[in-house]
A protein has these predicted regions:
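Conserved active-site segment immediately N-terminal to the catalytic lysine
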Residues: 156-191, 218-223, 288-289
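Structural detector of well-ordered beta-strand residues that form the stable sheet scaffold
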Residues: 55, 80, 101, 154-155, ...
Length: 397
């Protein structure tokens, strides 16, 4: 059996007529840049999330970059963010000449905590970027409280978390702004790059719209220097066609996560694998930690990330078995060569480093069958219990 990490063909087969009609309508209109198709999509997403404004952007990266620019982040400013995320979270800060002030993550959720963020604030802190990693919201009230004491702008990195929610609200609507990605692998994915920035502030919304179009509200008359961050109409058409299916897809992901938990709980003890809560250090051999879901949270499972001993050996075994998997992410920001001037070293953020060494994303797309999930579970457990290769005589242990 082959089980890919993501099967976009299975999704497209079910929605093909809707998507092709939407694309044909844009082609007939010949309105490819912004225009009514993009505006309709923005209004639909804003209404869905409960945001006053949704501004379509060319990618999740540009959605985050534009939010930072709208917040006035620039040289000499500090921006606090977790060291464990997709590169753009810190990369956008760096591009504006500001300094990413990195914090470690909670071992259970791999999200930054309010306590860690509060401890990292400096007199120069202009913004805070909490990340809703893998589809689960960070605990926002303590983060918002820390930001209020500092007077810092909170920009949510919700790129993996559309429709995620907790008692504080919906991802992307709790802080001053929220950034979303519509990369094809996301729960709501386009046919290429796309993104969106949300806000409840009218002034920030106007600034975001200026920034995405080179700072011009009127063509060739530029109030500020922006960029070309526009969401094109073809992507907006695809996303609009997909949007009515998102509830069912999210429910499918959550159901698959629950089934994984049941299947691992059923099968792991019989092969000598222990299920345990995530720990701050590396996961020991023979131990498997399933994703932790905070009480009262709607986790949308863009990724189903387990932590386990001998991760690389298990990953290799899964490749042999035809099971797709991926490491999100193998190198935390503080150990990236491009951020060497920040002065960090290995050991500074041990929880993120441990997760980078033992985390593994398994297939979680909504079209997965029970048989496929059973196959994945069996393959993971077989990889965990596979005997280590014999060490040749005379070789170092």
């Amino acid at each position: 059996m082959q089980v890919p990490l993501l099967d976009l063909s299975a999704q497209f087969a079910r929605i093909r007529p809707d998507v092709l009609r939407a694309l044909e309508a844009v082609c007939d209109s010949q309105r490819f840049i912004l225009g009514p198709t993009v505006e309709a999509f923005e209004q639909a997403v804003a209404g869905r999330l409960g945001a006053a404004h949704a501004v379509g952007m060319s990618s999740g990266t540009d959605a985050l970059l534009a939010a930072l620019m709208a917040a006035g982040v620039g040289p000499g400013d500090d921006v606090v963010t977790p060291t464990y995320s997709f590169f753009a979270t810190a990369g956008c800060v760096w591009r504006l000449g500001a300094r990413p002030v990195l914090v470690d993550v909670d071992p259970a959720t791999l999200n930054a905590t309010g306590e860690a963020i509060a401890a990292a604030l400096t007199p120069k802190t202009k913004a805070i970027i909490p990340v809703h990693l893998y589809g689960q919201m960070a605990d926002m009230p303590p983060i918002l409280a820390a930001a209020a004491r500092q007077g810092a702008v909170v920009i949510e990195d919700a790129c993996q978390a559309i429709d995620a929610a907790d008692s504080s609200g919906t991802a992307g609507t709790v802080g001053a702004m929220g950034a979303f990605s519509f990369f094809p692998s996301k729960n709501l994915g386009g046919f290429g790059d796309g993104g969106l920035t949300t806000t409840n502030d009218d002034g920030l919304a106007r600034q975001l719209r200026l920034l995405r179009g080179h700072g011009a509200a009127t063509r060739y008359h530029h109030e500020i220097v922006g960029g070309n961050f526009r969401l094109d109409a073809l992507q907006a058409a695809v996303l609009t066609a997909k949007l009515p299916y998102l509830d069912a897809w999210t429910a499918g992901r959550r159901a698959n996560a629950a089934r994984y938990r049941a299947l691992f709980a059923e099968a792991a003890p019989g092969v000598g694998v222990s299920l345990a809560a995530p720990i701050a250090g590396p996961t020991p051999d023979g131990v498997l930690s399933l994703p932790f879901e905070r009480p009262g949270v709607t986790h949308v499972y863009n990724q189903f990330v387990v932590r386990l001993g001998r991760r690389d050996a298990v990953k290799a075994h899964l490749a042999e078995a035809g099971v797709g998997c991926e490491v999100y992410y193998p190198v935390p920001f503080h150990l990236q060569a491009c951020f060497a001037s920040l002065g960090h070293r290995r050991g500074d953020f041990p929880i993120a480093e441990a997760a980078a060494g033992d985390s593994l994303a398994l297939p979680i797309y909504p079209e997965l069958t029970e048989a496929q999930q059973r196959y994945v579970v069996d393959a993971v457990l077989a990889g965990m219990t596979r005997p280590r290769p014999a060490v040749p005589a005379g070789s170092p242990a």
